[in-house]
Design a protein with these regions (language model features):
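Hydrophobic positions on the alpha1 helix immediately C-terminal to the Walker A/P-loop
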Residues: 64
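ATP-dependent NMP and nucleoside kinases share a basic, alpha-helical "lid"
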Residues: 146-202
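Walker A (P-loop) phosphate-binding loop of P-loop NTPases
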Residues: 58
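Pre-Walker A adenine-sensing motif
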Residues: 32-44
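Conserved lysine of the Walker
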Residues: 61
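Conserved nucleotide-sensing/catalytic segment adjacent to the nucleotide-binding pocket
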Residues: 82, 89-143
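Charged, amphipathic alpha-helical linker segments immediately N-terminal to NTP-binding catalytic cores
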Residues: 1-30
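Small-molecule kinase domains that catalyze NTP-dependent phosphoryl transfer to phosphate-bearing small molecules
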Residues: 151-152, 173-176, 201-250
Length: 250
């Protein structure tokens, strides 16, 4: 097996500059074939199509979605893709602070489980996705600089809309009805221990101590990772993230 050739790219992801890297063979053998299939699908349907990219935390799904969108506009013969995040449909912080949920017999504020399925406005997401199939619409975004939702921040108008998020394929009410809105469903799986290491490292890079980062993982991230794995719905194709951050098709 020959050594992987990694290419570095500079992008803006979630409003922040990022340097990312992808394996050149993965770009040629996985990313571009996906974009060609989506191009064929969109042209055959002769309308806007919706693609769901569902993955657990720390798989780089937001970055991947943005990269695929960028690739679609730089490679000849591809239909343009627009990347959109599900995180814009978080309930606003003021709502989360004012509402609670019962967990293990204890009533806790929604702010303490932000990012869990219960902290999203699923009816609003479903309505927006349904409308987006028929016309150009505005989408909210989640701004990580202020850690809150910004309404009507972007216009979704590309022929292919690639929507990414943790729970788009969650096989639980009220989420499971969303899958019928997608023309193509892609899921990324990853080993929980790999995600743990990546999430703790990300927190430490953000200024947390290793102990605090590990505690946050156990309280917040770990339940979400387990829930994703246990209740992931059907997908048209499944990729797996490897230990070096590469992707393979299963």
């Amino acid at each position: 097996m020959r050594e992987k050739e990694w290419h570095t790219y500079e992008m803006i992801v979630n409003g922040l500059p990022q340097k990312i890297r992808y394996n050149a063979d993965t770009v040629e053998g996985l990313f571009l074939p996906l974009l060609r299939r989506l191009t064929e699908m969109q042209r055959a349907e002769a309308r806007r199509i919706l693609v769901f990219l569902a993955a657990p935390p720390a798989t780089g799904k937001s970055t991947l979605a943005q990269f695929l969108a960028q690739l679609s506009r730089t490679e000849e013969g591809l239909t343009p893709v627009q990347a959109l995040g599900m995180d814009g449909f978080h309930y606003p912080n003021r709502y989360l602070a004012a509402h609670t949920i019962l967990r293990d017999g204890e009533e806790i504020p929604l702010t303490s489980i932000k990012g869990a399925p219960e902290t999203f406005d699923v009816p609003a997401l479903a309505a927006k996705l349904g409308a987006a199939r028929e016309e150009s619409v505005t989408f909210p975004v989640y701004d990580r600089r202020i850690h809150d939702v910004v309404p009507d921040a972007v216009t979704a108008d590309a022929p292919i809309l690639l929507v990414e998020g943790n729970w788009l394929l969650l096989d639980e009410e009220p989420w499971r009805d969303l899958c019928g809105l997608a023309d193509h469903r892609l899921r990324i799986d990853a080993a929980p221990e790999l995600l743990r290491d990546r999430l703790i490292a990300r927190k430490v890079q953000g200024g947390s101590t290793t102990e605090a980062a590990a505690a946050f993982y156990e309280a917040s991230d770990a339940p979400n990772i387990l829930r994703f794995a246990a209740h992931a719905g059907a997908a048209d194709e499944i990729w797996r993230m490897t230990a070096d951050g590469d992707f393979t098709r299963m």
